[in-house]
């Protein structure tokens, strides 16, 4: 498995394919391995990189500088990707962010990439809210517990024997955010995203109430924004992201979007 050293962290990543770079920001509790099907699909046309956040998957499980992470949780992950790209001499990329990974991807496209002189060519953000009030964030975390119950073996494969401790640590931090009022991606970051953006999701996602209203709000803030919302989940477990619950529809929409972007 390929690794790269970024400061005090060993970062595990998966790299497959050739062409323009497409980097995947996993959902909070996922590892790069969780996106094997997306990697296999998009690597037919792109050089796909999916990585494990520090504390998850095959990356270092030690938690260094917790104060920095707590101050800028999603921005920290966005900054990490900048260093990963710079280390590999990659100057531009397309981005796919899922769930909590979409929040880090928004930070990356609207702030950190510019700071590191990286060009973001496009961004696909799937199944997320960029504004969690206290109640909604607690509810999202409650729903996430159902994913644990049905996927114990998978989570252990992704993260190792200490998977429960890692996920509980993430949940504890996010519960703290919720208790302090929730979390919202700042408008100035959304306003600063200069690349084309595609927001995807399904309207039956029980973990993301008011998704259509939230995406409409984001489309007013992001300069070049396209929406696709499915009327069905395609899967009985509604907390799954649209990219997984209806992969054929997601890939069709993503392909059309990327074709438009690359044709410019």
Residue ranges of predicted features:
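Alpha/beta-hydrolase fold catalytic core
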Residues: 1-25, 45-46, 91, 252-264
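Flexible "cap/lid" loop of the alpha/beta hydrolase fold
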Residues: 103-151
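Catalytic active-site module of serine/aspartate enzymes centered on a nucleophile-bearing elbow/loop
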Residues: 225-264
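Conserved HGGG/HGGXW glycine-rich cap/lid loop of the alpha/beta-hydrolase fold
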Residues: 9-63
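Conserved alpha/beta-hydrolase "acid-adjacent" motif
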Residues: 206-214
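Short beta-strand/loop motif that positions the catalytic acidic residue
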Residues: 193, 199-201
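Active-site loop/oxyanion-hole signature of alpha/beta-hydrolase fold enzymes
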Residues: 50-93
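Active-site nucleophile elbow and catalytic-triad environment of alpha/beta-hydrolase enzymes
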Residues: 172-189
């Amino acid at each position: 498995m390929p690794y790269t050293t970024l400061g005090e962290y060993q970062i595990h990543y998966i790299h497959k394919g050739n062409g323009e770079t497409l980097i995947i920001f996993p959902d909070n509790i996922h590892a790069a391995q969780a996106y094997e099907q997306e990697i296999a699909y998009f690597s037919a046309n792109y050089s796909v990189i999916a990585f494990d956040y520090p504390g998850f998957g095959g990356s270092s499980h030690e938690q260094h500088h917790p104060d920095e992470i707590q101050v800028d949780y999603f921005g920290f992950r966005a900054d990490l990707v900048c260093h990963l790209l710079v280390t590999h001499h990659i100057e531009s990329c397309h981005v796919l962010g899922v769930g909590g990974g979409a929040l880090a991807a928004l930070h990356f496209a609207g702030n950190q990439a510019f700071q590191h002189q990286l060009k973001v060519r496009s961004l696909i953000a799937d199944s997320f809210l960029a504004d969690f009030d206290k109640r909604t964030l607690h509810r999202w975390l409650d729903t996430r517990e159902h994913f644990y119950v049905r996927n114990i073996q998978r989570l252990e494969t992704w993260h190792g024997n200490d998977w429960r401790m890692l996920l509980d640590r993430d949940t504890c931090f996010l519960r703290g955010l919720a208790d302090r009022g929730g979390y919202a991606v700042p408008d100035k970051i959304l306003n600063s995203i200069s690349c084309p953006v595609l927001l995807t999701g399904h309207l039956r996602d029980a973990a993301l109430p008011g998704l259509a209203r939230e995406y409409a709000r984001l489309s007013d803030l992001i300069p070049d924004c396209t929406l696709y919302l499915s009327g069905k989940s395609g899967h009985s477990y509604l907390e799954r992201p649209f990219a997984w619950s209806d992969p054929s529809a997601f890939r069709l929409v993503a392909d059309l979007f990327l074709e438009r972007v690359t044709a410019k």
